[in-house]
Regions:
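Polybasic/polar functional segments that serve as interface/processing modules
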Residues: 1-31, 39-77, 91-94, 99-112
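Active-site beta-strand termini and strand-to-loop segments that position acidic
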Residues: 79-81
Length: 112
């Protein structure tokens, strides 16, 4: 999907680590079609990644984020685009929450 590529590219531009997308369409869920996940070692970098994802989605896909959470504390930022939910973690929070393990049946693609 084009928008997933825009998001992963925006993450990689800001040196995000562990970038992956999870295709949830074949799972019996109504949450969204895709998760796009990454992590960074600092809150400053988490914020920079989130800002770049939002900017690139506006520029290249003409899409505004519908809802966002976590920008204040920068431990785990969630950007909700309805069909795509973006998760940007600080490294230790990604290890703790392990979203990939919770959604292990999803088809996962790694980008770095």
């Amino acid at each position: 999907m084009k928008d997933v590529k825009i998001i992963t590219g925006a993450m990689l531009d800001k040196k995000a680590q562990g970038v992956c997308s999870m295709d949830l369409r074949k799972l019996d869920t109504t949450i969204c079609d895709y998760f796009v996940i990454c992590h960074a070692d600092s809150g400053v970098q988490v914020a920079a990644i989130a800002d770049n994802v939002e900017e690139q989605m506006v520029l290249k896909a003409r899409r505004q984020v519908r809802r966002s959470q976590g920008k204040e504390n920068r431990f785990w930022v969630i950007l909700d685009y309805s069909d795509i939910v973006v998760h940007i973690f600080q490294t230790e929070y990604r290890r703790f929450y392990r979203l990939e393990d919770l959604w292990a049946d999803a088809v996962t693609q790694h980008y770095n």
